[in-house]
Regions:
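Active-site-proximal beta-strand elements of phosphoester/diester hydrolases
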Residues: 7-19, 114, 127, 151, ...
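C-terminal beta-strand edge segments of enzyme domains
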Residues: 220-347
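Active-site glycine-rich loop that binds ribose-phosphate moieties when present
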Residues: 134-152, 167-171
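N-terminal glycine-/serine-/threonine-rich phosphate-binding loop
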Residues: 1-43
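Short hydrophobic alpha-helix segments
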Residues: 121, 127-128, 260
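CN hydrolase (nitrilase-like) catalytic-core segments centered on the catalytic cysteine
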Residues: 77-98, 158, 164-268, 346
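Short beta-strand scaffold segments in enzyme catalytic cores
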Residues: 101-103, 114-117, 150, 247-249, ...
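Cys-nucleophile CN-hydrolase/nitrilase-fold catalytic domain and related Cys-dependent amidase chemistry
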Residues: 22, 34-120, 190-212
Length: 347
């Protein structure tokens, strides 16, 4: 891996998906990477679940009516890895750019809100799933696990990512801070709730930058008026699919490095001087000299979740020690089962 750069040109992409085609949205991603490369961008962040699109229908349609839209999203959702990730990987490699992309990942019969980090050589450095879908999203996505609550070393530095209201889970943010995150990649859907969502987002990302002493690159999506009408014909509900955009780049001192984009499509671009991280942490390092781990600490389960667990068979091998003692060996109880058991398993 190349030596970490001292200055990084970053971009937050606020663009509209293709609500009719996963390939169309992927083409928009590749086109935007090429455009960013022409402007010297070295890291780009796309909105939450941008491929094929955020499930806006789940916010404005009653659950009993969501079946057709939900099934269509499942049909269009990519697998990871798959043709979509191959295309983005090749584009990242060609541009020499770190790409952070949100997707609806299909894993057999379930969908997940998944964040992908491609390094500048095209390698998929991180795949993580949103640990708790928010409100209406629970009708669409499954829950992620703790295996992705980590940062990854990339050509531009240590990168971490969270999606939307995961930023209101302080322990999730602290997990990334504890791994000395340098560039935090935040993703929100955009075109949702209204201006209050954008205002809250600004407070949220600036607070994380200040508390963690890292840069934050935040990307939100955008819907055109015809797309809003395609999601719902109810004019009152259409108002819930406008506003809520706040693509921005924030320094470790909590300052905007470029004017946030709250309307329309475009790229927010800024140069990140990584020396500012040490300047900020010299005064307050929340996971270093300003921490009190003997008083307050975080426990994380990073083992991947699984729906099955292999158990030992009923007959346990007799060892020389147990034979000499005339006893049967105690079974090895797997950790996930051992937690919460009040007594050993019977023979």
């Amino acid at each position: 891996m190349a030596e970490t750069k001292k200055t990084v040109r970053a971009a937050a992409a606020q663009i509209a998906p293709d609500l009719t085609s996963a390939d169309g949205t992927t083409a928009r991603v590749l086109e935007t990477i090429r455009e960013a490369a022409r402007q010297g961008v070295e890291l780009i962040v796309f909105p939450e679940t941008f491929v094929p699109y955020y499930p806006y229908f789940s916010f404005v349609q009653p659950p009993v009516q969501q079946g057709p839209a939900h099934l269509l999203l499942m049909e269009r959702a990519p697998t990871v890895p798959g043709p979509m990730t191959d295309a983005v990987s090749a584009s990242a490699r060609e541009a020499g750019m770190v790409v952070v992309l949100g997707v609806n990942e299909r894993d057999h019969g379930s969908l997940y809100n998944t964040q992908l980090v491609f390094d500048a050589d095209g390698a998929l450095a991180l795949k993580r799933r949103k640990i708790t879908p928010t409100y209406h999203e629970r009708m669409v996505w499954g829950q992620g696990d703790g295996s992705g609550l980590r940062t990854v070393a990339t050509r531009v530095g240590r990168v971490g990512a969270l999606a939307c209201w995961e930023h209101y889970n302080p322990l999730a943010r602290y997990a990334l801070m504890a791994e000395h995150e340098e560039i935090h990649c935040a993703q929100f859907p955009g075109s949702l709730v209204g201006p209050i969502f954008a205002d809250q987002m600004g407070v949220t990302i600036r607070h994380h930058a200040l508390e963690s002493g890292c840069f934050v690159v935040n990307a939100t999506g955008w819907l055109h008026d015809d797309q809003v009408r395609a999601v719902t014909s109810d004019e009152k509900l259409q108002a819930a699919l406008r506003g809520g955009c706040h693509s921005a780049i924030v320094s470790p001192e909590g300052k905007y490095l470029a004017e946030p984009l709250t309307e329309g499509e475009g790229l927010v671009i800024a140069d990140l001087d990584l020396a500012l991280i040490a300047k900020r942490k010299r005064m307050m390092d929340s996971v270093g000299h300003y921490a009190r781990p003997e008083l307050l600490s975080l426990a994380i389960r990073r083992d991947p979740a699984t729906t099955t667990l292999a158990l030992p068979c009923a007959g346990y091998p007799v060892t020389s020690e147990s034979a000499a003692a005339g006893t049967e060996p105690e079974p090895e109880i797997p950790g996930p089962l051992r937690r919460g058991l009040h007594s050993p398993l019977g023979h």
